[in-house]
Amino acid sequence: MQQVSCGTLVLNSARQVLLCHVTGTASWDIPKGLQDPGETPLQSAQRELFEEAGLDFDAGLFEDLGEFAYRPDKRLHLFKVEVGEELCNLDHLRCTSFFPHQRTGEPTPEADGFRWASREELSSLCWPRMASRLLSIDW
């Protein structure tokens, strides 16, 4: 059975998408993660957005973009939230989801930076599979 990873495309007024820098890599990603038992896809997307970026939006702001093929063992269920000038500065965003550091075992945030990116930048910032999937969606 395929796992479902739920994520959110947070878009600003310039139609740029919010990306989180994946700690310990050169790649950026949208806030997303596996759906927990008992969660709806929307609840999962909201939780992941809060854990990975500290953003808490009302459920009514999320537009369901649907479920998409991603990997043989995983599908993506994506949502979209459009924001205005309230998010032009990303300095206050914080990741509160941690994993043990590979060498030290110290708690390490999943994301250690945030930025806005245009569609044209996705291929150079994201993993190829994610960039391809995001570019295939009309947002």
Where are these predicted regions, by residue range?
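N-terminal strand-loop-strand
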Residues: 1-30, 57, 79
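The catalytic Nudix box helix
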Residues: 30-64, 79
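A generic structural signal for short hydrophobic patches within well-formed alpha-helices
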Residues: 35, 122-123
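Active-site-adjacent beta-strand/loop module that shapes the phosphate/pyrophosphate-binding cleft
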Residues: 68-103, 115-120, 133-138
